[in-house]
């Protein structure tokens, strides 16, 4: 499994997940989409389709691979001396975003700044690149704001790329224009923690985690 680590005051890892497993998740989502509840009331995004997927994640072919990635991330921060607790992880919430042209996610954090968060790109449409100068900003980028808030690290979306980062790491998703019109960009995200707090109900769906 190919992985890269970026360190700039926050620990960010990106994994390339198997496309056949990504396709399976897309198929499962399309089958269940009409029955899923909106999760938008708990999210920062300015988009229409934000649906909860927590109870279905463990049934996908990606579940085992995702569990391996979570453990690898924790192993990384353990080696860096950042984490020294029992490794027993719990997914608190999972949702899928279908983002249309002009929609976006403003700079935000997750889950009261505790634990870790993820972004997995499931579908990426062809963007219109109408910039005339090479130094101009590209639309549709995923941005991670630096620890000192001076700069931002930008990532160009690619299907199968899975990012894991601290919940307190400010990030954002820029709007885009597509060709042909009407295509969506699909991502899945979830929050996970090492310890369940008293005011948090443990999900009965995360027992598949190793």
Model-derived features: positions:
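Non-heme Fe(II)/2-oxoglutarate
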Residues: 1-86, 102-105
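Hydrophobic, well-structured mid-protein blocks that either form specific transmembrane helices
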Residues: 81-83, 87-94, 118
């Amino acid at each position: 499994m190919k992985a890269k680590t970026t360190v700039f005051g926050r620990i960010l890892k990106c994994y390339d997940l198997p496309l056949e497993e990504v396709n399976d998740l897309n198929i499962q989502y399309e089958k269940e989409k009409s029955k899923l509840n909106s999760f938008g009331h708990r999210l920062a995004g300015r988009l229409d389709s934000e649906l909860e997927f927590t109870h279905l994640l463990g049934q996908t072919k990606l579940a085992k691979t995702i569990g391996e990635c979570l453990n690898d991330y924790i192993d990384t921060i353990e080696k860096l001396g950042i984490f020294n607790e029992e490794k027993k992880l719990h997914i608190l919430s999972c949702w899928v975003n279908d983002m249309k042209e002009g929609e976006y996610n403003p700079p935000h954090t997750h889950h009261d700044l505790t634990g870790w968060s993820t972004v997995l790109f499931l579908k990426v449409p062809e963007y219109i690149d109408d910039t005339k100068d090479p130094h101009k900003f590209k639309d549709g980028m995923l941005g991670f704001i630096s620890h000192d808030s001076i700069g931002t690290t930008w990532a160009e979306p690619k299907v199968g790329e899975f990012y894991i980062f601290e919940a307190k790491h400010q990030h954002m998703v820029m709007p885009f224009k597509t060709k042909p019109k009407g295509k969506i960009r699909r991502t899945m995200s979830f929050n996970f923690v090492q310890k369940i707090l008293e005011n948090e109900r443990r999900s009965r769906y995360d027992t598949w985690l190793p």
